[in-house]
Amino acid sequence: MKIEKASHISQPVQLSTCTLIDTYPGHQGSMNNKEVELYGGAITTVVPPGFIDASTLREVPDTQEVYVNSRRDEEEFEDGLATNESIIVDLLETVDKSDLKEAWQFHVEDLTELNGTTKWEALQEDTVQQGTKFTGLVMEVANKWGKPDLAQTVVIGVALIRLTQFDTDVVISINVPLTKEEASQASNKELPARCHAVYQLLQEMVRKFHVVDTSLFA
């Protein structure tokens, strides 16, 4: 499989600080997440119930695995998620950054540029495993279809898993488009509880990420 190299786009811009909160009653965390096979079974991790493989709906790049939320409003999963989140796993060539946090920022910059903005704020950052695994939660104002008048506040959980033996950076991103009410809450320096649920999901996806077949990187 051809692994594409991410390109350096922009520098992070510090915005106002928000507080990450968890107020979702009955949140059960990872209890209901299910194991999935990625890239033809070469990699495994977990995704929540109610998320479907986007390749069954549309074409997805070879380096990516995409899962979209297909839940309905009347369904109850008790995991803190809503109905509009999406998950992307991307295999990229390792960027020339020895510091893992700097490499993570590099990939975040690419993601935000794809969303039509260069301004983003890191809400939370964690080293999961020294030198190889880093996670964070960022917030941006994305321009839909490049139109500022359609701007939407988006929170993104971003994980970097560095597979040094394969010269590969695995980037997992979970997108959370905020409603107007949630965006208003965020502007008051608080985030909706589902952002915390997304971050817990991201960290579990990283913990349970396993390479099963190394020929994927041959």
Curated annotation (Swiss-Prot):
CDD domains: Mog1
GO molecular function, one term: guanyl-nucleotide exchange factor activity
Annotated GO biological process: mRNA transport; protein import into nucleus
Domain of life per record: Eukaryota
Residues annotated as transmembrane: none
One Gene Ontology term, aspect cellular component: nucleus
Alphabetical UniProt keywords: mRNA transport, Nucleus, Protein transport, Transport
Pfam family, one: Mog1
InterPro entries, A to Z: Mog1 (IPR007681), Mog1/PsbP_a/b/a-sand (IPR016123)
Localization per record: Nucleus
Sequence similarity: Belongs to the MOG1 family.
Subunit structure: Interacts with GSP1.
Main function: Involved in the Ran-GTPase system for nuclear protein import and poly(A)+ mRNA export.
Further information: Present with 2840 molecules/cell in log phase SD medium.
The protein's name: Nuclear import protein MOG1
Upper taxonomic lineage: Eukaryota, Fungi, Dikarya, Ascomycota, Saccharomycotina
